[in-house]
Amino acid sequence: YNMKRLFLIVTMIGLATVVMAQPAKRRSTTSNAVAQQGAQNRAGTTQQGTDRAALLFPVKQTMPEDVAWRRDVYRTLDLTMDANAPLYYPVEPIGRQVNLFTYVFRLMLTGRVDAYKYNLNGVESFEKNDKMEVREVLDRYSIFYEEKDGKIHVENNDVPSAEVTRYYIKESVYLDQRTGTFATKVTAICPVLMRGADDFGGEATPYPLFWLNYDEIAPWLSKLPMMASNLNNVNNMTADDFFTMNRYDGKIYKTNNLQGKALANYCSTDSAMAKEQKRIEKEIVDFEENVWG
C-alpha cells in the first residue's frame, strides 16, 4: 500500500512539472519568434537603407585587369558649365570649404599624393621616373612660395585655383564578364591652368599641370564634401561620389588608338570635331546595346 501511494505521489509530481513547463516553453517560443521577426524587420530596414544609399552613392568599383572589352577616352571638363561647377567653387577657401584644385594642391604640397608629368603626347604615366617634384611644379608655373626649414609654404591667395577652369580626365568604359555589367571608371585627372585671356577677345592658353592617379587620390576625395548642384546647397556628396557617379559633363578630345592621335589632329573644323565626338559616343552606346542583343 505504501509503495503504491509513493508511486502515485511521484507520478502526480511529474505530471504537474510537465504542465507547468508548457506555458514557459510556449512563452519562450513566442518570445523567440517575436525577436526573430524583429531582427528580420530590422535587417530588412537596414538592407533597404543600404540599397537606397548604394543607389545614391555607389561604392567605388575596382576595374578588373582581364575585362572582356574596354574603351579608353579622354575628356575635357569645362568648369564654367553648371554640371562641373561643384569642382570649381568655392574659388577661394571659405572656412574649411575648398574647391577640388586647392584640395589636391595641398595634398601634393604636403607629399600625401604624387603628381606625374604631363607629357607632350598627353598620355599619363604613373611610373616612378615620371613623378614631379613639388618645386618643379611651383617653378614651372610661377606659383609663389616660401621655404623655411626645408618646408615649402604657399599662401591661399597664391594658389591659382581661380585659373584652373578646366580638367582633363581619362575614363575607361568596360564590360566585366564576371558580373555581366558595363561600368565607367575615371582613372586619371589633370588640372589645367587657363592663362593669357585678354579684354580684346584673346583666348586663354591651356597649361596642363600634372596627372593624378585616381586610385591614389580616391581615399582623399572621399573626404572632400561638395554641393551636388546649384539647386541644393547641402554638402551631401563627396568629390569621389561626383566622379564615381559620372556627374560631370565632358567632351571627348582623345581616345586610345594605335596612332596616338587626338581628335584635333584629324578634325580640321569645329563641326568635324563635334561630328567625331558624337560618333565615338554612339559607338560606345551601340556596343553595349549589341552585347545584350
Describe every region a protein language model picked out.
Residues 181, 186-206:
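Extended serine/threonine-enriched, polar tracts that run as long, contiguous segments within proteins
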Residues 10, 158, 178-180, 201:
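Residues embedded in well-ordered secondary-structure elements
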